Each structure stands twice: as structure tokens, then as C-alpha cells.
Amino acid sequence: LEFYRLVNENTSRWILYSDILGGTYLVGILFLIPNLQSGLPAIYIFIPYLIYLLYSFIIRLYLKEENPITSWGHSFLGQVYIALPLGLLSFIAYPPLATEYLLMPYNALLVIAFFSFIWINDTGAYIVGCTIGKHRLFERILPKKSWEGFFGGLAFSLLLGWVWSTQCSFLNMGQWIGLSAVVSIFSTWGDLCESLLKRTLNVKDSGNILPGHGGLLDRLDSIFLASPATVIYLYLLIS
């Protein structure tokens, strides 16, 4: 809801509510797929979502929008940029890893590790950036971020990856450190992408639901690229 209000405040309620329902359903079915025990092919649970996609195209024929192409773009960007990454968090909890891991159908440790890497990356980047940051990372998008802060956050994440490797053996040390690097780098890109979105729309915060901290997008921006990147890493490079 926050995203769609941000990108298009004047959109039709028919579109706004259908986009929210579509995104919510996409997150739900992505969480359901790893637990699908019945013989029902997975494609059947996507049918309502396919109906939403068809509706999104057809409804524009009957609404007098000034720029329906932009409206379509906003609708589908919300699905890909917000709903899909959130739904993919379930695939982090159910990755096809080593035999020891497969004995446990669900294990929250990778999800906890995922968020711990994001947190330590932000913390490390802030500490190092405030202390010695001089060279701007992306001045035209986010002037406060520095290369020193970026590498500081990455170093903190790699160190935490090593700590995780000493406690959890279902990934070896190299895999843990690789995972920490992936989350660190892509969470930084996620932060930059959300800042580019706000700069393009000429807004400071994505919302005001969290006083003093902006909106939910401002708090979750690191997830939106780190989640898909983590799934790719786990499924293609480790499994």
C-alpha cells in the first residue's frame, strides 16, 4: 500500500486494491510452495494470480488514465520489487542443501542469518562511514554513503559469516562467507535503488508510519534485492 501510494497517489481504487491483493497473494503462494504436500500441481495455485495479471491489463481499457503504460509499470513494479522478494524469504528457509540440512524440512537459522547480515552490514557501514568516510559511493543518489562505509559494512558481514560457520555446520566456512558477501553487497544496492526511487519521486521518506524512521520501505529496502540474490546463491551455487 505504501509503495503504490508513493508512486501513484491518484490511481483508481480498483487498481490500488487489486494490486495490493495481487501482491499479498503472490507472497502467500510463494510461502506455500515449499510446503505443498498434495498432488495438486503447483501451477494451479498460480491461477488466481494469473487472473489478477489479466485484470490489470483489461481494467485500463475502461479507465481514462492519462498514461496507462506508466500505470501498468507501477502495478507490476510493485509485484516484482516488493511482493516477490518478500515471498522468496520462504525459499531461504527451505533450500536444498546438504544431507544434514535436509533432515530438517524447516530451519529458521538461514533466515536469521540473512537478517543478521543485513543488520551488521548497515551497522558496520554507518560506523566506518561516519569515522573515516570521505569518498562518495553514489553521490547523485545517496550523498551520505561512502566507499569506506561500504567496505566497512562488507568487512563486518564477512566477520559475522565466519562466526556463523563456527556455529552451524550445514554450510562450510567458504559458503557462509560467500553468503554474507552476497547479502552485504545486494542489501547495499537495495538501499540505493530505494533511494533512487524516492529521489525520482522527489520525496524524502517513503511514508510516515514509523515516526523518525520514515516508512516501511525505508526500513525494508535492503531486503528487496538481497532476498532474490540469496535464493540464487543458495539454489545455484550451493545446492
Predicted regions span which residues?
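Active-site alpha-helix of zinc metalloproteases
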Residues: 117-118, 183-187, 214
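Hydrophobic transmembrane alpha-helices of multi-pass small-molecule transporters
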Residues: 157-158, 219, 226, 235
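C-terminal transmembrane helix pair
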Residues: 198, 223-225, 229
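Juxtamembrane interface at the ends
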Residues: 125-126, 130-131, 195-203
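Interfacial loop-to-transmembrane junctions
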Residues: 200-222
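Juxtamembrane boundary at the C-terminal end of a transmembrane helix
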Residues: 232-239
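Membrane-embedded alpha-helical bundles of polytopic integral membrane proteins
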Residues: 1-181
